[in-house]
């Protein structure tokens, strides 16, 4: 393809609105243009990459016998009311009405739509298992869209759904798609990790995320530096084994802590480490109050608390409300004496491993010293409620936790019967009885994947696209378009390369060589072939993007040389 005929509006200056490299270079290199906040047009080069990503996804999904479909973008609101998500999804959901005052939403996901079709059409276990998928636009009204395609209001997504008659069918489908996702992300050249994740608003229990490693990522990943463990910070755990405290229990006594408002204040006044002060955080979980007791040197993990309670809503209680019930302000709250206040008590599992804690007394200015869980508290539940710390021992006992940032590019869920039980998704099983269809759902954010690849594939000059997704294989540049020998050789090389299966972008523009080279570096095609001063000798200059060295190559050997060079590249 001739560069003079393709729309590539490159820019020299860094756009003011762009903060991360992927956004900066995609604007400068003419890959995307903003239409509105969080809404972008994919220009020809970006569209070519999107098409290649989608092709790889289709190959791997078809390999596991998944069926491609296409669902509507506009969905009747009653489907989401039927599942209950219409009332819980929040303000990210675009809503509209037609001229007959009927409610619709612009789909942020498609679980309900797929469930509706399967529920209507499949009534016997004999028609299952089944995996369906689509590549479709999605819409979310992000409060603050940012970083280009990484957080937009409209985006491209591949979403898949498995339907099974039993748990084994779900497990098998989950494993198949998990393996397919790994092949997809390997093929596009990503540095990524599969991590334990929270299901969030999708429903279900078991889930995993695929995270592209990137300093600009919004998610924090905790992983073992010498094992396979990896988890989103929301779900990350530390190594734990229950043990008997190694010190004798002392008598529970009240001690003064005047003017102490924080754990640090208490520790300074009492001359003890913050770890030995067990703090109490009070939450409103749906329709009940919950007190969570954790060591003072840790932060509470609200996702873990919410999942433990199986709560739909969780928020920290207001101090005024807490004072009415506890009789004390934040900083003086504790678990002793709460059993008569109709408050559910959760205690982090690490509290039981040590003796003689300091805890709030529910009287301002006083704490209890020598609190021992098994002696001083009844009617409590234990679990892991801590936000893991970097450097702590990995839960598998192999190495220590290291934190890094990532961009979520894929998510897989075992939904179970979360949707089918509410939306009439029943079949007659092998025993002739009705049972709910068991679902899984599996997503890849394609436009976000494009940005993640871009974040990992650049240098100060521009992009260095992995060969599997690069818009072209070869950037063929004519140094002087007024030189007949160079022009003719360029045409012959272009013809030969295309016949050999290469995708070639021919820079035939009447621009200075410096402009052409700068644009070539910015666009980031894997290999550059320059037809210049040695054209009469049938010799061209070959350079791989991201490498400093160049090679003078005879046109007789060019195809073989380029094939070898491409094989060397990522």
UniProtKB/Swiss-Prot annotation:
GO terms for molecular function: aminoacyl-tRNA deacylase activity; ATP binding; catalytic activity, acting on a protein; proline-tRNA ligase activity; transferase activity. Its EC number is 6.1.1.15. GO terms for biological process: prolyl-tRNA aminoacylation. InterPro entries: aa-tRNA-synt_IIb, aa-tRNA-synth_II, aa-tRNA-synth_II/BPL/LPL, Anticodon-bd, Anticodon-bd_dom_sf, Pro-tRNA-ligase_IIa, Pro-tRNA-synth_IIa_bac-type, Pro-tRNA-Synthase_IIa_type1. It catalyses: tRNA(Pro) + L-proline + ATP = L-prolyl-tRNA(Pro) + AMP + diphosphate. The keyword Transmembrane does not apply. It holds the Pfam family HGTP_anticodon. GO terms for cellular component: cytosol. Homodimer. Consists of three domains: the N-terminal catalytic domain, the editing domain and the C-terminal anticodon-binding domain. Catalyzes the attachment of proline to tRNA(Pro) in a two-step reaction: proline is first activated by ATP to form Pro-AMP and then transferred to the acceptor end of tRNA(Pro). As ProRS can inadvertently accommodate and process non-cognate amino acids such as alanine and cysteine, to avoid such errors it has two additional distinct editing activities against alanine. One activity is designated as 'pretransfer' editing and involves the tRNA(Pro)-independent hydrolysis of activated Ala-AMP. This is Proline--tRNA ligase. It comes from Oenococcus oeni (strain ATCC BAA-331 / PSU-1).
């Amino acid at each position: 393809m001739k560069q003079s005929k393709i729309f590539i509006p490159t820019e020299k200056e860094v756009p003011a609105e762009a903060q991360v490299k992927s956004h900066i270079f995609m604007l400068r290199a003419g890959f995307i243009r903003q239409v509105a906040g969080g809404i972008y047009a994919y220009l020809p080069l970006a569209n070519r990459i999107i098409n290649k990503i989608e092709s790889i996804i289709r190959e791997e999904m078809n390999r596991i016998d998944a069926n491609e479909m296409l669902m509507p973008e506009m969905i009747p609101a009653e489907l989401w009311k039927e599942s209950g998500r219409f009332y819980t999804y929040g303000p990210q959901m675009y809503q509209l009405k037609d001229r007959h005052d009927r409610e619709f939403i612009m789909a942020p996901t498609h679980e309900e739509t797929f469930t509706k079709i399967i529920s209507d059409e499949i009534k016997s276990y004999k028609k299952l298992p089944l995996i369906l998928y689509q590549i479709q636009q999605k819409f979310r009204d992000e409060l603050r869209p940012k970083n280009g395609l990484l957080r937009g209001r409209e985006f491209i997504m591949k979403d898949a759904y498995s339907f099974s008659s039993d748990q084994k069918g779900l497990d098998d489908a989950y494993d198949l798609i998990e393996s397919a996702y790994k092949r997809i992300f390997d093929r596009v050249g990503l540095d990524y990790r599969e991590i334990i994740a929270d299901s969030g608003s999708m429903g279900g229990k078991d889930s995993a995320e695929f995270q592209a490693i990137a300093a600009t990522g919004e998610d924090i990943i905790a992983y073992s530096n010498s094992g396979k463990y990896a988890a989103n910070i929301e779900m990350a755990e530390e190594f734990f084994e229950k043990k008997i405290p190694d010190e004798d229990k002392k008598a529970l006594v009240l001690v003064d802590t005047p003017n102490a408002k924080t754990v640090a204040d208490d520790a300074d006044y009492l001359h003890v480490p913050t770890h030995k002060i067990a703090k109490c955080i009070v939450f409103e979980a749906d329709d009940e109050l919950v007190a969570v007791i954790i060591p003072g040197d840790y932060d509470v993990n609200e996702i873990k608390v919410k999942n433990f309670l199986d709560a739909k809503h969780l928020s920290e209680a207001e101090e005024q409300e807490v004072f009415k019930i506890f009789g004390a302000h934040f900083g003086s709250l504790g678990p002793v004496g709460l059993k008569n206040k109709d408050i559910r008590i959760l205690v982090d599992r690490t509290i039981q491993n040590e003796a003689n804690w300091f805890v709030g007394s529910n009287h301002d200015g006083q704490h209890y010293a020598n609190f021992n869980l098994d002696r001083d508290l009844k009617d409590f539940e234990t679990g892991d409620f801590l936000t893991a710390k970097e450097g702590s021992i990995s839960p598998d006992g192999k190495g220590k936790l290291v934190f890094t940032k990532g961009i979520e590019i894929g998510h897989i869920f075992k939904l179970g019967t979360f949707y089918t039980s509410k939306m009439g998704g029943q079949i007659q099983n092998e025993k002739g009885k009705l049972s709910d269809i068991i679902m899984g759902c599996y997503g890849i954010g394609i436009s976000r994947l494009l940005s993640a690849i871009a974040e990992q594939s650049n240098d100060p000059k521009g992009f260095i696209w992995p060969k599997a997704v690069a818009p072209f294989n070869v950037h063929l540049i004519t140094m002087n378009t007024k030189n007949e020998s160079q022009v003719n050789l360029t045409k012959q090389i272009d013809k030969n390369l295309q016949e050999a299966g290469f995708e070639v972008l021919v820079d035939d523009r009447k621009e200075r060589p410096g402009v052409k080279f700068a644009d070539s570096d910015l666009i980031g095609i894997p290999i550059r072939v320059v037809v210049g001063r040695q054209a009469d000798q049938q010799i061209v200059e070959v350079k791989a993007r991201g490498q400093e060295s160049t090679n003078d190559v005879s046109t007789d050997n060019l195809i073989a040389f380029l094939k070898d060079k491409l094989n060397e590249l990522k």
